[in-house]
Amino acid sequence: MGAQIRVYRQKISSTTSMRKIFKAMELIATSRIGKARARVAASLPYANAITRAVSAVASQSEIDHPLTTEPEQIRRAAVLVITSDRGLAGSYSASVLKQAEGLNELLHAEGKEVKTYLVGRKSQAYFDFRNREYARVWTGGTDAPEFGTAREIGAALLADFAADFEDGGVDEIHVVYTRFKSMVTQEPTVIRLLPLEVVEEEAASESDLLPLYEFEPETEQVLDALLPRYIESRLFAAMLQAAASELAARQRAMKSAGDNATDLIKKYTRLRNTARQAEITQELSEIVAGADALAS
């Protein structure tokens, strides 16, 4: 009986230590979410401004630009999957990968090859474990993305988009990431990056008119300058949304783990007390039995 009590004491001690770790990680994630959300909000003015500029150029100009023109036949599609570097974030990365798998099945059903690009060690581990190929991977800092990384990813995707099919080029580019809606709601999302589909995060009302531009010297040159920056801003916005979603998912996961640890501690404490009470009862019974034996 004493050994059983010691086991419960050890379980209570180890679970209490884990609860402290969970609580610390929850507090860290909570403190970082505010910064992540602030970065998302700070990126919106630039993203919306360049989106409106690209929309105005594309809508007011009769041009045939490779980044805005739908190809006659789409033979190969690129899919960029944005997950986390670290775990302990509940089903965050698993939900993104599930969304990516659904997109892959859809593209294959349409007769398209799929060329995959990865962001985050979780997606890399997922593909490595299944011996599946991917073109490139970027890891490090998924919970605090830098614009330089978005620029590097954008350059790689644009290079493959401009390349010929025989050289590994792609005809369209999709991005799979997690859209941050609120602290309790994050939604795995797919967007088509190229050919251009202008999507403004906070669209203006229908009564607002797009600005009128005079192009100097040529409209194509304006698009050549704007579109790469537009792609970079869309990628960076997706990475910032994913980072905020990752931290929110980790905060919820750690809170849930801490609550479960508290429940386990209560359970083990109750079992320990029951075992201790049984031990005391047994000892008293033995004492009474011994006294009765001596009296007789």
Swiss-Prot record:
One GO biological process term: proton motive force-driven plasma membrane ATP synthesis
GO molecular function list: ATP binding; proton-transporting ATP synthase activity, rotational mechanism
Keyword Acyltransferase: no
Short name of any one Pfam family annotated for the protein: ATP-synt
Cellular component per GO, a single term: plasma membrane
InterPro entries membership: ATP_synth_F1_ATPase_gsu (IPR035968), ATP_synth_F1_gsu (IPR000131), ATP_synth_F1_gsu_CS (IPR023632)
KW Metal-binding (keyword) present: no
Family indicated by similarity: Belongs to the ATPase gamma chain family.
Role of this protein: Produces ATP from ADP in the presence of a proton gradient across the membrane. The gamma chain is believed to be important in regulating ATPase activity and the flow of protons through the CF(0) complex.
Principal location listed in the UniProt entry: membrane
PROSITE patterns named in the record: ATPASE_GAMMA (PS00153)
Known partners and oligomeric status: F-type ATPases have 2 components, CF(1) - the catalytic core - and CF(0) - the membrane proton channel. CF(1) has five subunits: alpha(3), beta(3), gamma(1), delta(1), epsilon(1). CF(0) has three main subunits: a, b and c.
Name of the protein: ATP synthase gamma chain
Gene that encodes it: atpG
Keywords for the protein's UniProt record, in alphabetical order: ATP synthesis, Cell membrane, CF(1), Hydrogen ion transport, Ion transport, Membrane, Transport
Species name: Pseudarthrobacter chlorophenolicus (strain ATCC 700700 / DSM 12829 / CIP 107037 / JCM 12360 / KCTC 9906 / NCIMB 13794 / A6)
Membrane topology designation: Peripheral membrane protein
